[in-house]
């Protein structure tokens, strides 16, 4: 609480000047490549002058964490642990309660929006969202994801009956998104939302830095003209893609084309092109007819689907997962260092290490975790290997549920199960022993004989030489405290 008589650092959104009050042309430059005398007569802007909407929009140079409004927006990564100026400021002013609240959220996917309280902030709520990483090769996907960020934030605000929202710039430079491109999407999406749901929100604040302000001030007139004259002047500078009725980016090749004469024949050139297009249909794995999946499952239950057909169906499913694992950005999962390849065991088999304490189950997308597991393991599982799982100092928030583990076991290729020769469960607890016994006895019985409960690192070293395995420091410290520095008797070693 501020001392009596002290001036608050927070800024009331209602006290800030709205866009309608900023004079036409004040502080703005003509967009790059344009001329003030560009032809525009007779054209109608897709974003016409509307003073009622302009009164709801505010451009403010300042820290979004200091805004006094119903909700403000935090931009982060999929584990909601990103370090950036916006997030750092929000966490600093909100107090320790926000960090505790974030533990309850199971992360946030790119383009989604999730809600928490504002705690010590002047804002009542914080809406967390995850902007996309920009790569020129995947520009369309990045644009769609960024649109989803803004749209989902606004939709959540509408559903919760919020009066005002303070936006930071969601597409940070850390994620390599071109500032001008991201600003077009932000302004366009907000404009379309206010057109359709203007009664739901009283104020939308764009909180920007000094570096970002110039771009916003230059592009705002395109989407929020403050006069009929400014509306006409802005037309030549609008981008070619202005989105659909909701501001969502439009991909022409994905739109369904409808013939002007459905009952008639197209001309020869169109027919020739159609024949050419049809010639490639079915030439790739994902375009083949698969039949009714539910029917196949019923037949399998009735014993009418052959083992070979089931195996083929399983292989196709795994190949789809593998294709995704090779193309999706899994850098957030890789950064956890929860799964990595080490050396070889006494039999020359590859050693893969899983660090349980590095798996924040509640904060990550477990589907992406499965994709990363497949990405790392596909080439390793082609030959014999062993898994070393460090259960050391794990908590409830580090334990995937049995349904996830069963699903993973069912999805992976048969080579994973065939070539896994041992799973060393290091530093088990009584509870983990009971859980693993039930899981390997009743859920995945084929794994039971391969699981070894390992009480100490000295016991593990009888199977995997210490120089062949990278062990996290906290595991070494724990083992030294619990088991001492000396090797136990040879009789306690693992028998292979």
Swiss-Prot record:
Residues 254-264 have a biased composition (Basic and acidic residues). Signal peptide: none annotated. Residues 44-224 form the Macro domain. Coiled coil: none annotated. Residues 22-45, 252-271 are annotated as: Disordered. Pfam families: CRAL_TRIO_2, Macro. Residues 329-483 form the CRAL-TRIO domain. It comes from the Eukaryota. Belongs to the GDAP2 family. This is Ganglioside-induced differentiation-associated protein 2.
């Amino acid at each position: 609480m501020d001392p009596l008589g002290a001036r608050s650092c927070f800024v009331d959104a209602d006290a800030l000047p709205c866009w309608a009050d900023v004079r036409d042309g004040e502080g703005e430059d003509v967009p790059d490549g344009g001329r003030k005398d560009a032809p525009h007569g007779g054209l109608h802007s897709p974003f016409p002058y509307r003073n009622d909407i302009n009164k709801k929009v505010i451009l403010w140079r300042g820290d979004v964490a200091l805004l006094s409004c119903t909700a403000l927006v935090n931009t982060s990564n999929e584990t909601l642990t990103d370090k950036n100026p916006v997030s750092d400021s929000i966490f600093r002013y909100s107090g320790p309660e926000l960090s505790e609240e974030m533990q309850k959220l199971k992360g946030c996917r790119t383009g989604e929006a999730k809600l928490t309280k504002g705690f010590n902030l002047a804002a009542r709520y914080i809406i967390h969202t995850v902007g996309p990483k920009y790569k020129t090769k995947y520009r369309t996907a990045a644009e769609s994801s960024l649109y989803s960020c803004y749209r989902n934030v606004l939709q959540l605000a509408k559903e919760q009956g919020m009066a005002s929202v303070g936006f930071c710039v969601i597409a940070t430079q850390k994620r390599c998104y071109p500032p001008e491109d991201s600003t077009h999407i932000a302004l366009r999406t907000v404009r379309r939302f206010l057109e359709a749901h203007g009664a739901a929100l009283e104020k939308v604040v764009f909180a920007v830095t000094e570096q970002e302000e110039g771009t916003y001030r230059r592009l705002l007139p395109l989407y929020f003209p403050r006069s009929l004259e400014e509306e006409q002047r802005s037309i030549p500078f609008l981008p070619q893609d202005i989105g659909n009725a909701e501001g969502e980016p439009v991909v022409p090749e994905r739109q369904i084309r409808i013939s002007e004469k459905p009952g008639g024949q197209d001309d020869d050139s169109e027919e020739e092109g159609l024949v050419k297009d049809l010639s490639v249909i079915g030439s790739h794995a994902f375009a083949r007819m698969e039949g009714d999946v539910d029917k196949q499952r019923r037949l399998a239950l009735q014993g009418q689907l052959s083992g070979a057909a089931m195996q083929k169906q399983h292989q196709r499913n795994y190949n789809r997962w593998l294709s995704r694992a090779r193309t999706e950005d899994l850098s957030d999962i890789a950064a956890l260092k929860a799964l990595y390849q080490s050396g070889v065991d006494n039999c020359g088999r590859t050693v893969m290490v899983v660090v349980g304490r590095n798996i924040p189950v509640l904060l990550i997308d477990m589907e992406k975790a499965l994709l990363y597991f497949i990405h790392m393991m596909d080439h390793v599982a082609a030959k014999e290997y062993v898994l070393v799982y460090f259960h050391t100092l794990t908590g409830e928030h580090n334990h995937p549920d049995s349904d996830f583990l069963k699903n993973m076991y069912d999805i992976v290729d048969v080579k994973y199960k065939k070539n896994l020769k041992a799973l060393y469960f290091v530093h088990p607890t009584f509870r983990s022993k009971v859980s693993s016994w039930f899981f390997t006895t009743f859920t995945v019985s084929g794994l039971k004989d391969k699981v070894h409960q390992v009480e100490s690192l000295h016991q593990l070293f009888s199977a995997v030489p210490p120089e062949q395995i990278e062990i996290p420091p906290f595991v070494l410290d724990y083992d030294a405290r619990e088991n001492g520095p000396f090797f136990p008797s040879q009789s306690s070693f693992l028998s292979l």
